[in-house]
């Protein structure tokens, strides 16, 4: 028999499927964009070039900024010993790293000690940012997915 509870449960299943499909389609495209088009990334190390330190002066004249390089990957910003007098900032392209990771735009990885991090981004000169933020689209999907999962759990436990 068709009840209101069945209708709500079916609606939630459809919503979950749509969110899952959009997430499945969107995330691989984000990674693929990073690897298939050239962008410009800053190339510097604050140990040898004070212009690389945070706060980064992205409004300075190009001659007063660290060099840019063409990148066939993602821009990277690495920080070691953050918020200390020994802080070191390095900005580069992923093609210079000897790691093989599935990279998604605006993802940051923290050092286990909590004293540093490495962030990836896919736009021209994006590794000039002091704080790279998680992509807004992903942030909107997470609460929706959690809410749908909770509601489904409530309905199925009855």
Swiss-Prot record:
InterPro entries: QVR-like, Sleep_regulator. One of its GO terms (cellular component) is membrane raft. It comes from the Eukaryota. One of its GO terms (biological process) is rhythmic process. Bifunctional regulator of neuronal activity in the mushroom body, and possibly other regions of the brain, that acts as a signaling molecule required for homeostatic regulation of sleep under normal conditions and after sleep deprivation. Reduces neuronal excitability by enhancing Sh/shaker K(+) channel activity; possibly by stabilizing Sh/shaker to increase protein levels, accelerating its activation kinetics, slowing C-type inactivation and enhancing recovery from inactivation. Specifically affects the A-type K(+) current. Interacts (via loop 2 of the three-fingered Ly-6 domain) with Sh/shaker; this interaction may stabilize both components of the complex and may be required for targeting or retention of Sh/shaker to neural cell projections. Interacts (via loop 2 of the three-fingered Ly-6 domain) with nAChRalpha3 and potentially other nicotinic acetylcholine receptors; this interaction is required for antagonism of nicotinic acetylcholine receptors. Residues 54-67 are annotated as: Loop 1. Residues 128-158 form a propeptide. Its main location: membrane. It is a lipid-anchor; GPI-anchor. One of its GO terms (molecular function) is GPI anchor binding. Residues 1-32 form the signal peptide. Belongs to the quiver family. Expressed in mushroom body (at protein level); overlaps with expression of Sh/shaker and nicotinic acetylcholine receptor (nAChR) components also involved in sleep regulation. Expressed in the adult brain and head. Enriched in the mushroom body, anterior optic tubercle, superior protocerebrum, antennal nerve and visual projection neuron fibers projecting into the lobula plate of the optic lobe. Disulfide bonds join 41-75, 44-52, 71-93, 108-119, 121-126. This is UPAR/Ly6 domain-containing protein qvr. Consists of a single Ly-6 domain, adopting a three finger fold stabilized by 5 disulfide bonds. The first loop contains a region essential for protein folding or that is required for localization to the cell surface. The second loop mediates protein-protein interactions. A lipid is attached at residue 127 (GPI-anchor amidated asparagine). The chain crosses the membrane at residues 136-156. It is found in: Cell membrane; Membrane raft. Keywords: Biological rhythms, Cell membrane, Disulfide bond, Glycoprotein, GPI-anchor, Lipoprotein, Membrane, Signal, Transmembrane, Transmembrane helix. Residues 77-91 are annotated as: Loop 2. It comes from Drosophila simulans. Pfam families: QVR (PF17064).
């Amino acid at each position: 028999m068709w009840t209101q509870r069945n209708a709500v449960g079916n609606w939630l299943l459809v919503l979950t499927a749509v969110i899952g499909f959009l997430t499945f389609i969107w995330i691989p495209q984000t990674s693929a964009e990073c690897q298939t088009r050239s962008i410009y990334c800053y190339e510097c190390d604050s140990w040898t070039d004070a212009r690389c330190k945070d706060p980064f002066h992205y409004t300075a004249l190009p001659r007063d900024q660290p060099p840019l390089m063409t990148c066939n990957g993602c821009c990277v910003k690495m920080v070691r010993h953050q918020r200390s007098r020994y802080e070191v900032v390095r900005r580069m392209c992923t093609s210079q790293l000897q790691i093989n990771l599935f990279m998604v735009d605006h993802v940051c990885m923290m050092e286990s000690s909590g004293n540093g991090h490495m962030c990836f981004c896919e736009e021209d000169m994006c590794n000039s940012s002091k704080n790279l933020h998680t992509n807004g689209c992903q942030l909107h999907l997470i609460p929706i997915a959690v809410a749908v999962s909770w509601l489904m759990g409530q309905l199925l436990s009855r």
